[in-house]
Amino acid sequence: ILSAGSDIERTLLASDLVSIFRRLSTSWGDTMSTVLGNAVLALLESPSGGTLIDLRRFLVDDRFRKDYLESVEDEEITFFWRREYPLIGSRAIGPILTRLDTFLRSKLIRHVVGQKQAKLHLRAVMEGRKIFLAKLSQGLIGEENAYLLGSLLVSKFHQLSLARQQQAKADRTPFYLYADEFQSFATPSMESLLTGARKYRLGLILAHQTLAQLEAVPKITSALFGNA
């Protein structure tokens, strides 16, 4: 899940992951957003890639982080970790680790997000007119895990739709994304997904029960009615 093919996709994924963690945390601040965003970007920038398991180790293991940064070419990211982060200290990563530990505690979830070499290629699903079903039952994996995994999947399909900028319009295979209880997976990128999905031949079928469920995401509500 932690993979991206362009700078835009990397920025999108990092932003979405920060928003997901912020929504799940009772105590969150700008410093935590900065630390988590730069950690995700470091993994995405490295040719070695990374997983959410690597993300946790990157935050707590100084040696592991130092070795990882050797393969990161983005000077802004390396400057943050080598110069700014030591001034911040580890106090900023507590809520981040709490969410990661909750998420990775489930062996089922670890099997999904802990693979550097993906066995499921969502691009092939999207371009090959295939069907992909994700059962995100809160009773099976927990409410927070369902939200985190569902939001990451929505973000992933958004990345794949943006990658279609490199394709001729005639070559963009129509694909339809169905999201039940979609307000549970709302991230900032959902707004741009709603406004820009059509030109990338991505259709969205979003189900919810009442309009009151959308009050927590007003920008998405506006984009939803504007593009219905």
Stretch-by-stretch model annotation:
Residues 220-228:
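A short helix-turn-beta junction within AAA+ P-loop NTPase domains corresponding to the substrate/partner-engaging
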Residues 1-202, 215, 220:
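P-loop NTPase motor domains
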Residues 207-216:
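Conserved H-loop
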